[in-house]
Swiss-Prot record:
Protein name, per record: Chlorotoxin-like peptide Bs 14
One Pfam short name: Toxin_5
Highest taxon above the source species: Eukaryota
Taxonomic source organism: Hottentotta tamulus sindicus
GO terms under cellular component: extracellular region
Tissue-specificity statement: Expressed by the venom gland.
Length: 36
């Protein structure tokens, strides 16, 4: 899923939403439950 921006307070939420509810930011990458 799309990149995570550390300066965006919503980025973790956007990542999770993009991943269909399961997603985490690891550095600049948004990783879904499958790893990308």
């Amino acid at each position: 899923c799309g990149p995570c921006f550390t300066k965006d307070p919503e980025t973790e939420k956007k990542c999770a939403t993009c991943c269909g509810g399961i997603g985490r930011c690891f550095g600049p990458q948004c990783l879904c439950n499958r790893g990308y």
